[in-house]
């Protein structure tokens, strides 16, 4: 204990946790913000900050009012009568925890000072990648700790219990300072704190940020004090309020008006929001719903099926980086006052500068959706990726084009083929229907699939080396949006699947099959042997009449297949085992795994075409890319025009085999049956791979 306790010995120095936290905040500010952003942040913070004993800080009311978040009190209180969007207390608890980073175990809840606010903005926006060593994984741990509010012991008790064990290894605090520790300047930052990679191993969470501050030993001390953060849980009510806020603010654009999404919501809109929120909560285990959400369940849910859930926090907290009070023309205005002939400089508007809308625009034309609504679109944005550069569909300015609706175009495979097979771009298939339980009660269900390749006969996935980690936006996805949120990611071994396992299969005899094994064509194939068979982690079959859809989800893998089972992401699958090995290993898994089969009476079936923004199209326009130089809508219309001209040309064929009108109609009937003219020209076998 001798030398390590001395604060005056050679090679020793004393640094408080508070001082290190401030120094780290300044490092964050210099690394993650521009000088202009810092100027705006300082103006926003100090113009509203309270002062107590020389400490400038924000309280919950100031934070909620600035962000426009309902908090059950103040000006943002009267947003909804049921208070379901009153997430102000939840957000304030999160920022109070994150403001103490990386010493949240000894300092949290922290006072929301300017330094704390700097760290909060970095950690709650996409700037976190510059300071967290393991990026998204570390951020999930921090977010869980900031939300956990059930079963957490009092921090003072934890400090007292840890004091005796930590005294010798860290150094006893000097008189009058309960958070001052000593450590050697020659401490090796490469020395591991733990050898295991367990979920509770957070010791390297912020080592990269602290190495240059010579604060590694203090950080390790802080981490040893409270490993019980993973023993605490997130209450269902806390997570429900946060989900509701994220659901309504998902389309929020940078510098957009937050109140537009949180105020004036009708009861019908709130009902759709609650439906999607409860669907996500239903994906958790029953034990989580009763006693709170544990870290393992939270981490698995976010990493495997809701990777973009917290994306709305980025534009929300980046509002702090724009101040309405700053007038950059003020200096020029003061100089012009001495010149009588100079025109007065107009005052800037009180609202932030406008920016292009970022919500996926549902293009007009075709039909009005009976499935899509703002809440469901937000739900899709939490897990659906349409671009490698900017995965979130709200951020990358994806546009949705109405391609097919069974309500508008009829429940016919001929009509489906005419509208869908001519769409040369990615698409989303949505189905809304009812599942009848054993008690004859109908439960409304919404399922769908993301198909990154066009529906066309000659389509196939581009060749990919098995060592390559596939981009999520290039893999298909099968999902259930309600009543239980379920996501089945595309397999990273997709390129190595056999030809009889196409992503999508279309036949006028068997209907539509997604993620199924297709039996070889044979005249002897009758009954069940002729139908596509479910494979992999899940499959979807739709009958030729577009009346019944069968969703099959497997607990394991029914051999190799297009989709992975629920709870497994393509990234983790490709990381744990190579694509070739994964495909080979799945064949050894018994096909007797328990399958959950849902027979859904279809109320409505819709196909929506995905059109990337023009800027992303330029980036993605490369060999093997789905983006063509010609707009997908223009391509489809050109195809329809060509088919119409061909139909007109065929009409001039002399169908008069006799001299009477009856013979003319008979001749035309023969041509229609042959598929040369009429609607039947769209029938036949279509095979998508």
Swiss-Prot record:
GO terms for cellular component: cytoplasm. The keyword Cytoplasm applies. The keyword Phosphoprotein does not apply. Residues 370-611 form the TLDc domain. Keywords: Cytoplasm. It holds the Pfam family TLD. InterPro entries: TLDc_dom (IPR006571). Coiled coil: none annotated. It is found in: Cytoplasm. Residues 343-359 have a biased composition (Pro residues). It comes from the Eukaryota. Belongs to the RTC5 family. May be involved in a process influencing telomere capping. This is Restriction of telomere capping protein 5.
């Amino acid at each position: 204990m001798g030398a390590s306790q001395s604060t005056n010995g050679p090679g020793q120095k004393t640094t408080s946790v508070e001082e290190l936290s401030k120094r780290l905040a300044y490092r964050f500010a210099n690394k993650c913000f521009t000088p202009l952003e810092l100027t705006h942040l300082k103006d926003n913070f100090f113009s509203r900050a309270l002062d107590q004993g020389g400490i400038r800080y924000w309280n919950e009311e100031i934070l909620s009012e600035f962000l426009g978040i309902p908090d059950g009190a103040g000006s943002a209180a009267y947003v909804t009568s049921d208070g379901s969007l009153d997430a102000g207390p939840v957000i304030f608890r999160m920022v109070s925890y994150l403001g103490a980073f990386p010493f949240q175990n000894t300092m949290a809840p922290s006072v929301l000072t300017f330094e704390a606010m700097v760290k909060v903005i970095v950690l709650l926006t996409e700037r976190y990648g510059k300071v967290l060593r393991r990026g998204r994984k570390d951020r999930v741990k921090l977010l869980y700790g900031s939300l956990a509010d059930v079963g957490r012991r009092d921090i003072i008790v934890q400090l007292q219990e840890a004091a005796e064990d930590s005294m010798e290894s860290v150094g006893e605090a000097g008189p009058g300072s309960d958070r001052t520790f000593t450590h050697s300047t020659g401490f090796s930052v490469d020395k591991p704190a733990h050898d295991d990679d367990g979920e509770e191993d957070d010791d390297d969470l912020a080592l990269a940020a602290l190495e240059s501050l010579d604060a590694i030993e203090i950080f390790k001390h802080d981490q040893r004090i409270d490993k019980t953060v993973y023993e605490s849980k997130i209450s269902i009510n806390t997570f429900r309020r946060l989900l509701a806020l994220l659901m309504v603010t998902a389309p929020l654009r940078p510098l957009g008006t937050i109140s537009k999404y949180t105020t004036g919501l009708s009861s019908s809109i709130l009902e759709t929001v609650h439906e999607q929120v409860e669907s996500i909560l239903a994906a958790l285990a029953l034990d989580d719903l009763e006693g709170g959400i544990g870290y393992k369940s939270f981490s698995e849910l976010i990493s495997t099926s809701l990777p973009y859930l917290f994306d709305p926090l980025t534009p929300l907290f980046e509002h702090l980086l724009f101040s309405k009070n700053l007038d950059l023309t003020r200096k020029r205005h003061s100089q012009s006052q001495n010149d009588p002939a100079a025109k007065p400089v107009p005052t800037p508007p009180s609202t932030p500068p406008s920016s292009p809308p970022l919500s996926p625009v549902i293009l007009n034309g075709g039909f009005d959706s009976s499935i899509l609504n703002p809440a469901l679109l937000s739900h899709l944005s939490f897990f659906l990726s349409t671009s490698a550069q900017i995965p979130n569909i709200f951020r990358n300015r994806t546009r949705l084009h109405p391609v097919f609706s069974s309500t508008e175009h009829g429940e016919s495979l001929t009509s489906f083929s005419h509208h869908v097979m001519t769409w040369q771009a990615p698409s989303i298939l949505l189905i809304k229907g009812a599942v009848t339980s054993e008690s004859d009660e109908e439960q409304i269900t919404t399922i769908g699939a993301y198909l990154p390749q066009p529906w066309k006969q000659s389509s196939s996935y581009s060749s990919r080396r098995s060592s390559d980690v596939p981009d999520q936006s290039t893999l298909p996805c099968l999902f259930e949006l309600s009543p239980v949120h379920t996501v089945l990611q595309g397999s990273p071994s997709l390129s190595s699947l056999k030809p009889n396992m196409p992503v999508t299969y279309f036949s006028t005899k068997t209907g539509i099959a997604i993620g199924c094994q297709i039996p070889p064509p044979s005249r002897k194939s009758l009954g069940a042997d002729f139908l596509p068979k479910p494979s992999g982690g899940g499959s979807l079959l739709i009958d030729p009449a577009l009346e019944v859809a069968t969703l099959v989800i497997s607990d394991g893998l029914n051999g190799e297949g297009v989709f992975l089972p629920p709870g497994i992401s393509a990234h983790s699958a490709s990381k744990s085992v190579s694509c070739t090995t994964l495909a080979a290993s799945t064949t050894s898994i018994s096909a007797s795994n328990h399958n959950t089969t849902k027979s859904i009476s279809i109320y409505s079936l819709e196909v929506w075409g995905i059109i990337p923004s023009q800027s992303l199209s330029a980036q993605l326009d490369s060999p093997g890319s789905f983006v063509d130089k010609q707009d997908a809508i223009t391509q489809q219309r050109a195809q329809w025009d060509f088919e119409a001209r061909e139909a007109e040309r065929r009409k001039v064929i002399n169908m008069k085999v006799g001299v009477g009108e009856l013979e003319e109609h008979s001749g035309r009937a023969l041509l229609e049956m042959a598929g040369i003219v009429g609607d039947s020209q769209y029938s036949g076998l279509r095979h998508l791979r």
